[in-house]
Each structure stands twice: as C-alpha cells, then as structure tokens.
UniProtKB/Swiss-Prot annotation:
Domain comment (free text): Switch 1, switch 2 and the interswitch regions are characteristic of Rab GTPases and mediate the interactions with Rab downstream effectors. The switch regions undergo conformational changes upon nucleotide binding which drive interaction with specific sets of effector proteins, with most effectors only binding to GTP-bound Rab.
Name of the protein this chain belongs to: Ras-related protein Rab-13
Location within or outside the cell: Cell membrane; Cytoplasmic vesicle membrane; Cell junction, Tight junction; Golgi apparatus, trans-Golgi network membrane
Spans annotated as Disordered: 173-195
Molecular-function annotations in GO: GTP binding; GTPase activity
EC number, UniProt record: 3.6.5.2
Keyword Lipoprotein: yes
Protein keywords: Cell junction, Cell membrane, Cell projection, Cytoplasmic vesicle, Endosome, Golgi apparatus, GTP-binding, Hydrolase, Lipoprotein, Magnesium, Membrane, Metal-binding, Methylation, Nucleotide-binding, Phosphoprotein, Prenylation, Protein transport, Tight junction, Transport
Positions of the propeptide segment: 198-200
In-chain residues carrying the UniProt-annotated modification Cysteine methyl ester: 197
GO biological process: angiogenesis; bicellular tight junction assembly; blood vessel morphogenesis; cellular response to insulin stimulus; cortical actin cytoskeleton organization; endocytic recycling; endothelial cell chemotaxis; exocytosis
Cofactor: Mg(2+)
Binding annotation for Mg(2+): 22, 40, 63
Amino acid sequence: MAKKYDFLFKLLLIGDSGVGKTCLIIRFAEDNFNSTYISTIGIDFKVKTIEVEGKKVKLQVWDTAGQERFKTITTAYYRGAMGIILVYDITDEKSYENIQNWMKSIKENASAGVSRMLLGNKCDIEAKRKVSKETGEKLAKEHGIRFFETSAKSSINVEESFTSLARDILLKSNKKPGPSGREVKLTSTEKKSSSKCLLL
C-alpha cells in the first residue's frame, strides 16, 4: 500500500503537570476540548497528518507526564524527538519559572540541534494572568526559539504553533545532506492509533 505521507516527525510536549499539554494535543489532533482530563500517567501519543510546504507531514505528538516521579520514563523519549514543545500556564508563575529546568532537561537528554518552541497556554484566562506575553517572548528570544500564546479551550494558535514547528523541522531537514532528508518510514506493524503506557 502506498505511503500517505512524505515525512514523519516525532514531537514531544514537556512542562509542569496541569499546564494543559494533553488538552493542546487533543485540540490539535482531534479538534476537541474537555476540561476534566486526568493527569497523564507516563507517556501517550496522538497522530495527525498536515500539509507543510506542499508536503504531507505526519506528526506523532507525544504527551509526557509533568510530575517528577515520571521523569526517568519521559526523558527516555527526548532522544528520538525532532521537535520539543515547552509549555507553561500563563496563570501559574511557577510553571513559567520551571521552563528553565525543562530547558536544562532538553540539553541533557535530547539530540543536538532539536527544534524547540515555547508555548504560554491558557491565554483565554486573561483575568488570572500571572505571566505577561512580553515575559514569554523575552525568554523565547533568549533561547532563539519560537513563541506562541495558546488556548486549547478557545483553540487559539494551536494549529498555527504545531504547523510552524513542523515547518521549521522540514526546512532544517531539507538542508541536511543525503537524498532522503529526514524522512522516516513506518513499518506496517506500527500502531497508527493512540497508545498509552500505564504504570500500575
């Protein structure tokens, strides 16, 4: 059977527990929102194919648990990621301050040159804002990465942010030597639906 995509990119969302990583992924992959999601246990992923620069790009978006007790499991997934999205909650200053620790975690565990992006989530809750947009922009600029304020609930900048990161990875991969760029082939045995890893 013919392949239905040109590239497969693995993206990883990291950030403190409760910042809305799962909600962002479900909004992006399924265009759905539910405020009663329980915390992710270990790691989970969703798949969505989008069009970028005339190419069909299949995104495998991995959702990680933000709690410290799952750190050993989640950091194991950094290595194969081509894009890492750092998420904080604009109504929770601590989640923003912890972005520096997540950046350190990327440096220690991810592949060199991985594409990164910073998202300030829950921008629909303006009345409870604790982190200004300028503060987020400043941090992203310091690290030389893209920044978006998003809302999974109101569907603000969700599609745009994922697409822009996919475009960055695609353009970067096109500059690499070799005929295949960063194309990754899936075997027919690989599951195409959502998969969960639970710790009992």
